[in-house]
């Protein structure tokens, strides 16, 4: 039966019926439109911590969720609000969907509501904060919910007794207050205790304001909730002073709730037992009846269940089956001719599904419509589903309005349907479970996983659901390979482990493997044949490139570098035209666009090729490319290309699905040359779909353009990276690298970015020394300046400010003022917004105080750059703009059919579209004649590229004074301010920092909170962590403990310089010793760069490994140069071989290991265990 998920706005005192204690600081609620539209913000700011009682004067409707005692409007605690997507639906369909939602809401009296927050200070993700038992549903006609419902909205008020109906509430606000008062970092606590209840695998249900979930899903969520509550109890045991923050009337926010914290675990167990023990046999019956046209289906079902229980349910089911089989009405049960006629109108397979399957499944009529839609579109085969219902898990397609059916749901439904005949060892069930695991890994970016990954995931699943052991799971997979292989491809891979050879198995979804095969076949086909015969004169090409570089050497670039850059560009043009497939890679400013323009001109002028396509992953990048190409070709997004060229095979309105299986050879596109720009952003499915549409016989050139060091795509896989690695092995001349930056302002920026690449130690130290050359102190803060002489003028190109006084906002304002002053202006909006010359970048959207969400609200509401007369307007309007000030915004969804106004051609363009990543600024429409009154006061966005305007849909836009680094990929900005808050070490990767730094074209200002190491030290690699097997590029090093290989990756995913260091890292991991490789902060403190820093029982131990003592120069450097520096800094030096139980460790310890030690890894393990004991 149905339960509720409901979104509530973050409240800094636990929704205790009071105004937030710090309303100005707590801005997480402001993304909820009513905070602005009701204009209650000022009330909150002026009345912090005021008791709301029954007052309606509050910004967020949910401030009273856990308020003590009764509240207004019949004890309503929070609203349940559902929005119906109107896209591609007529008014009748919308009315029916709304009616079904209203009917389903009747079913949740006495059921349970899971409460969650969206924007919050705890996590980048949505977080569950509690669960309550629903006592009553208040009708939407009540004034509290609004008498006048919007045409696509259904609203109800939820009532529960705060004394008796709270199943659990997680004390997150109390935890933050505890950390603040104890001067503790919450990130440190979270390293030890798993306290944050992120929605994780359940994310599909946590969309919009409210959603319904089945008992089965509710049970899974509650089981995770039980783990979190028990973890909080462990935390309480070790931090007993935390309890007063829960129950002490003087400091606790909601002691009337939290005094029962000890009972929460038992509450959850009781609810789980209740939901698992539900006796409903046909919970899908009301959905089937509503689908067939019985508008009061849910009400009838509830009434029969209340009055007669299982017997009433059985009566309704039998009456339905009898009426359908005999084609005869039964008005006693509401089964009219209309119901029977609609059933007859269905295809036979769907009738069978409705009668004998759907009645057991907890599916709404809306979901049945979606299943029918996918059946009619031939996404799924109902004949096969009737034979094997688990296909619903494997084949149903998901979109924004339809969550796929997960294994746990369908499996519980099948147990209900089959009863004693249920077989947990069915190969079809096992296959569906395997597919489910692979789909969840796919959502994390992994296209391929090993048996180890499979086991790790399997063992986290609920054993009561899985019903079989992992060994049984593998045995069934092996025994029924023919059945498994219909949906999953299993590859055996040979791995060399020292002198031994091991066989590992890799698992990939069949659909993903098909995309990989398309890519592999394309690459290998083009490699086997020669490119068109073209007479290339390198000297002429070089001159052509010189002219394109404006026939002059850029200021700040010396002659030797300039000529070398031209050599590289010339070589790139020649090699890319000599190979049918190639890669052009390099950071911004190295001339990639110049090379591509030259290649396209030669393709046209010399080879006569006209069908040249440039495709990009985002609309923004397509617009930027078009601006640079001067009509040589029209760039468009991959999505638009597919939608336009293959509209007969493309489902683009509700699903992004291209029916490649139906595109025959003749239907494929004849293209002379395909250039894919920003290739690092293209995921495996998009790349596979694209290449699957092209007739390879006609394709003369395929060129991938991008920066190989950037972040992997948001979607699954890393095809650009895998193709690069493959070509590097089989055809290295087809890879063209541009390394010399020809923008003088960018040169130092690119050099700094190399800190996050795999460069040697000497180059790293050279860059660091350049950085430390101009170090200053400003109060408590440290400032590092990197300058460049450009045209005889010394310019500050990079500023790195380490903020130790805690005032990031002040430092941000100072950074903005510095950049404005350098550009001879004081007008922030003219410079940063209207002309897009300044961009703030941050790693996260909502995590912590300085995600893009909070920075954006600070800029528009509090910063010194808002003129006083505009402050109220900026505060009261979520998006605002006029000629003086405006909100900078970014489009976050593709809208292919959006009409826009072309400001250059001064005309409306039908279905031009606006695309994810496009940026611009808002302004409020003012009517200038009576015909435009309906648009008055609507917000319009003026986009930068192309120069178009469009009316906004607020759900498709976000503020963009600050954006996340991920959103910045594919864009460049003249001036960049990068903010790196503390506590994000596990989140920020090398690729993320590299991408952020290289977004800056002329000026970079980095603001680092607390310590420089928060910026410089990261061993995390998103590319290394992502598991793929495209072109057999699966990285096996994390599976096998010790593999001798240059630049090897450890079990933890970081690259080390030698196999011996990898051995040590993996041994540390094996015994549970935390370590960091090549910790730059130690270099900053002592002047040498140790191989490892260990953390054992809060004792810091440095580690140097001597791997080449047979080399005299190496030995001398270690003994005569490095060791004295350690001694000067007070380090006691101990050899690993000398450690025993009697060894005494001082405060500063350096351990030295040698190659000799690693000849016996078992002995090293024992030494490490001894080290743990004596520390």
Swiss-Prot record:
One of its GO terms (molecular function) is DNA helicase activity. ATP binds at residues 586-593. Keywords: ATP-binding, Nucleotide-binding. The keyword Nucleotide-binding applies. SUPFAM superfamilies: P-loop containing nucleoside triphosphate hydrolases. Coiled coil: none annotated. The lineage of its organism: Archaea, Methanobacteriati, Methanobacteriota, Methanomada group, Methanococci. InterPro entries: Coronavir_polyprotein_1ab (IPR050534), P-loop_NTPase (IPR027417), RecD2-like_HHH (IPR029493), UvrD-like_helicase_C (IPR027785). Pfam families: AAA_19 (PF13245), HHH_RecD2 (PF14490), UvrD_C_2 (PF13538). This is Uncharacterized protein MJ1519. The keyword Secreted does not apply. Disulfide bonds: none annotated.
């Amino acid at each position: 039966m149905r339960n509720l998920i409901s979104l509530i706005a973050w409240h800094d005192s636990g929704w205790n019926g009071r105004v937030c204690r710090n309303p100005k600081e707590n801005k997480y609620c402001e993304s909820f439109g009513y905070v602005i539209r009701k204009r209650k913000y000022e009330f909150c700011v002026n009345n912090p911590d005021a008791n709301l009682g029954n007052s309606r004067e509050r910004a967020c409707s949910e401030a009273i969720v856990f308020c003590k005692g009764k509240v207004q409007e019949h004890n309503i605690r929070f609203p349940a609000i559902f929005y119906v997507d109107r896209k591609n639906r007529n008014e009748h369909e919308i009315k029916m969907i709304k009616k079904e939602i209203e009917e389903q809401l009747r079913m949740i009296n006495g059921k349970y509501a899971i409460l969650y927050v969206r924007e919050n200070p705890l996590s980048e993700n949505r977080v569950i904060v509690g669960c309550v038992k629903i006592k009553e549903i208040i009708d939407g006609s009540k004034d509290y919910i609004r008498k006048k419902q919007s045409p696509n909205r259904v609203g109800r008020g939820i009532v529960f007794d705060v004394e008796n109906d709270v199943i659990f509430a997680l004390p997150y606000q109390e935890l933050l207050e505890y950390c603040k008062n104890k001067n503790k970092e919450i990130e440190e606590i979270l390293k030890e205790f798993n306290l944050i209840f992120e929605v994780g695998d359940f994310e599909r249900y946590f969309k919009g304001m409210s959603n319904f979930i089945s008992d089965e899903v509710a049970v899974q969520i509650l089981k995770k909730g039980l783990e979190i509550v028990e973890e909080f109890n462990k935390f309480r045991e070790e931090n007993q002073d935390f309890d007063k923050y829960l129950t002490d009337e003087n400091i606790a926010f909601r002691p009337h709730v939290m005094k029962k914290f000890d009972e929460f675990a038992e509450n959850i167990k009781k609810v789980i037992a209740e939901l698992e023990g539900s006796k409903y046999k046909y919970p899908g019956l009301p959905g089937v009846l509503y689908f067939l046209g019985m508008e009061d289906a849910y009400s009838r079902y509830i009434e029969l269940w209340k009055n007669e229980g299982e017997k009433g349910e059985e009566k309704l089911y039998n009456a339905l089956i009898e009426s359908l089989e005999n084609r005869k009405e039964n008005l006693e049960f509401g089964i009219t001719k209309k119901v029977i006629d609609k059933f007859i109108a269905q295809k036979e397979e769907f009738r069978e599904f409705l009668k004998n399957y759907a009645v057991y499944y907890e599916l709404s009529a809306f979901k049945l419509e979606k299943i029918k839609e996918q059946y009619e579109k031939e996404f799924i085969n109902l004949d096969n589903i009737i034979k094997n219902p688990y296909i619903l898990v494997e084949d149903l397609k998901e979109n924004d309005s339809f969550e796929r059916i997960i294994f746990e749901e369908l499996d519980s439904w099948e147990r209900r349907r089959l009863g004693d005949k249920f077989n947990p060892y069915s190969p079809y069930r096992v296959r569906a479970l395997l597919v489910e695991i692979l789909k969840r890994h796919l959502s994390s970016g992994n296209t391929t996983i090993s048996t180890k990954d499979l086991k790790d995931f399997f063992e986290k699943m609920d054993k009561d659901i899985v019903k079989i052991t992992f060994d049984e799971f593998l045995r069934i997979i092996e025994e029924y390979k023919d059945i498994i292989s219909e949906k999953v491809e299993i590859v055996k891979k040979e791995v060399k482990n020292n002198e031994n050879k091991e066989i590992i198995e890799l698992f990939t979804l069949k659909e993903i493997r098909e995309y990989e095969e398309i890519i592999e076949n394309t690459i290998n086909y083009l490699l086997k044949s020669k490119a068109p015969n073209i007479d290339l004169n390198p000297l002429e090409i070089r001159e052509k490139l010189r002219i394109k570089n404006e026939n002059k050497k850029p200021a700040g670039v010396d002659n030797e570098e300039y000529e070398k850059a031209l050599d590289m560009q010339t070589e790139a043009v020649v090699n890319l035209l000599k190979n049918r497939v190639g890669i052009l890679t390099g950071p911004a400013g190295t001339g990639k666009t110049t090379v591509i323009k030259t290649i396209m001109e030669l393709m046209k002028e010399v080879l006569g090729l006209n069908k040249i396509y440039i495709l990009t992953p985002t609309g923004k990048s397509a617009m930027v490319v078009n601006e640079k190409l001067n009509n040589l070709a029209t760039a468009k997004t991959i999505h638009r290309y597919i939608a336009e060229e293959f509209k007969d095979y493309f489902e683009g309105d509700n699903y992004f699905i291209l029916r490649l299986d139906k595109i025959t050879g003749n239907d494929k596109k004849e293209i002379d040359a395909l250039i894919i720009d920003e290739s690092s952003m293209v995921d495996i499915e998009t790349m596979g779909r694209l290449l699957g549409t092209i007739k390879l016989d006609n394709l003369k050139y395929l060129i991938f353009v991008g920066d190989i060091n950037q972040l992997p795509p948001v979607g699954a896989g890393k095809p650009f990276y895998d193709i690069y690695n493959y070509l590097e092995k089989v055809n290295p001349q087809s890879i063209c690298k541009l390394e010399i930056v020809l923008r003088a302002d960018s040169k130092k920026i690119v050099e700094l970015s190399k800190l996050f690449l795999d460069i040697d130690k000497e180059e790293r130290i050279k860059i660091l020394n350049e950085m430390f050359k101009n170090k200053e102190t400003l109060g408590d803060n440290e400032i590092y300046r990197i300058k460049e002489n450009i045209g005889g003028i010394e310019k500050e190109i990079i500023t790195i400010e380490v903020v130790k006084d805690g005032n990031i906002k002040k430092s941000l304002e100072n950074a903005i003022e510095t950049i404005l002053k350098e550009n001879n202006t004081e007008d922030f909006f003219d410079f940063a917004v209207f002309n897009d010359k300044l961009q703030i970048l941050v790693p996260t959207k909502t995590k912590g105080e300085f995600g893009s969400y909070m920075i954006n609200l600070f800029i528009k509401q509090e910063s010194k750059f808002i003129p006083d007369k505009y402050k109220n307007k900026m505060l009261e309007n979520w998006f605002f703009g006029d000629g003086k000030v405006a909100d900078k915004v970014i489009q976050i969804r593709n809208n292919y059919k959006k009409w826009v106004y072309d400001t250059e051609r001064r005309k409306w363009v039908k279905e031009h579209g606006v695309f994810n990543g496009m940026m611009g600024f808002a302004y409020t429409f003012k009517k200038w004649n009576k015909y435009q009154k309906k648009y008055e006061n609507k917000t319009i966005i003026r986009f930068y590229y192309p120069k178009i305007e469009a009316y906004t849909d607020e759900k498709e836009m976000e503020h963009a004074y600050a954006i996340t680094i991920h959103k910045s990929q594919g864009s460049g900005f003249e001036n960049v301010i990068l903010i790196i808050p503390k506590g994000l070490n596990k989140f920020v990767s090398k690729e993320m920092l590299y991408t952020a730094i290289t977004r800056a074209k002329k000026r970079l200002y980095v603001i680092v909170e607390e310590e420089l190491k928060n910026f410089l030290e990261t061993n995390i690699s998103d590319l290394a962590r992502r598991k793929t097997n495209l072109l057999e590029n699966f990285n096996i090093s994390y599976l096998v403990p010790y593999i001798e290989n240059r630049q090897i990756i450890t079990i933890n995913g970081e690259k080390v310089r030698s196999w011996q260091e990898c051995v040590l890292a993996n041994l540390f991991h094996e015994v549970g010793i935390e370590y960091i490789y090549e910790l730059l902060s130690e270099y900053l403190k002592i002047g040498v760069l140790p191989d490892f820093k260990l953390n054992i029982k809060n004792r810091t131990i440095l580690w140097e490994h001597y791997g080449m003592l047979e080399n005299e120069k190496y030995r001398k450097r270690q003994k005569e140069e490095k060791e004295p520096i350690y001694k000067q800094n007070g380090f006691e030096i101990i050899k690993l071989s000398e450690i025993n139980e009697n060894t005494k460790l001082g405060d500063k310890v350096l351990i030295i290991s040698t190659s000799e030690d690693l000849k016996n890894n078992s002995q090293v393990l024992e030494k490490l265990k001894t080290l743990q004991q004596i520390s």
